[in-house]
C-alpha cells in the first residue's frame, strides 16, 4: 500500500508539472489556474474512489451474487477452504466468497481493502470447469486482491481523469482565444463546446492507457494463479476459457477484474481489459521453461 501511495504522489506531481508546462507553452499563467487544478483533482478522483469504496455492494447487487456464509454443500465448502488457503499463502484476509448466476465461465474480484475483498464465481464456471481449473481461477482472483489491483486502477483512473479535465480546459481556452480573439475574457458557448469535444477525445486516450495497464495486470495475476494452484492448472483453465469463449456479460463495474474480458479485433483491442487468451497462455508457457 505504501508503495502505491508514493507512486500516486509522484504521478500526481508529474501531472501538475506537465500541466504547468503545457499552460506556459500556451501562454497561460499557471498561478491563475490553481482553482482549476484543485477542481480537477477533486472531480478527477471523486468518481474513481466512490466507485472503489462501493465496489463490493455494487458487484453484489448488479450480479445478484449469493455470499457463502455457511456452506450448503461440499462444493461450497471446497470453495471456502481453497480461498482461505490461498489467502493465507499470500498474507491477506480471506475475501468474501460468492456465487452468481451466469452461463458464461467467469469470475471476478473487487473491494477497496485487500483484507476485506470479494471473490465471486459464476455458476457456469462451476459447471464447466474441473476442480483443478477452478482452483487456478480462484488463485488468479486472489492474486488481483493481493496485488492491490483495484486500488491501483482507481489511482490511475483518478490521475488520468485529472489530466483530461485540466488539459481539455487549457487547450480549449487556447483554441477559443485563437478563434475569437478573446484573451482572458469571459468564455462563451464555443469554449464549452470545444472543451466537451476535447474531453471526449482525451478521455478515449485515457481509456486506452487504463486498458493497456489492465492488460499488463492480467499477466501478473495469471502468474499469481500459477503460483497458488500450479502452472499447468492455470494454463488448463485459460485453455478451457478459450474453448467456451464469448463476450463477457459481467457488469462494466467489475468486468476489468474478471478472469475473462471478451474478444475484439482491430481498434477494439485497444479498449479490452484483458489480453487475448493465446497471449496469456504463451506467457505462462514461456515462464515455465
Curated annotation (Swiss-Prot):
Spans traversing the lipid bilayer: 5-25, 33-53, 155-175, 193-213
Cofactor note: Binds 1 zinc ion per subunit.
Annotated GO MF terms: metalloendopeptidase activity; zinc ion binding
Active site: 141
Top-level taxon of the source organism: Bacteria
One GO term of the biological process aspect: proteolysis
Keywords: Cell inner membrane, Cell membrane, Hydrolase, Membrane, Metal-binding, Metalloprotease, Protease, Transmembrane, Transmembrane helix, Zinc
Compartments where found: Cell inner membrane
One annotated Gene Ontology cellular component of this protein: plasma membrane
InterPro entries hit by this protein: HtpX_protease (IPR050083), Pept_M48_protease_HtpX (IPR022919), Peptidase_M48 (IPR001915)
Residues engaged in binding Zn(2+): 140, 144, 218
Listed cofactors: Zn(2+)
The keyword Secreted appears for this protein: no
Induction: Constitutely expressed in rich medium it is induced at 37 but not 28 degrees Celsius in minimal medium.
Enzyme Commission code: 3.4.24.-
UniProt membrane topology term: Multi-pass membrane protein
UniProt-listed Pfam families: Peptidase_M48
PANTHER family linked: PROTEASE HTPX (PTHR43221:SF1)
Sequence similarity: Belongs to the peptidase M48B family.
Protein name (database record): Protease HtpX
Organism field: Xylella fastidiosa (strain 9a5c)
High-level lineage: Bacteria, Pseudomonadati, Pseudomonadota, Gammaproteobacteria, Lysobacterales
The gene coding this protein: htpX
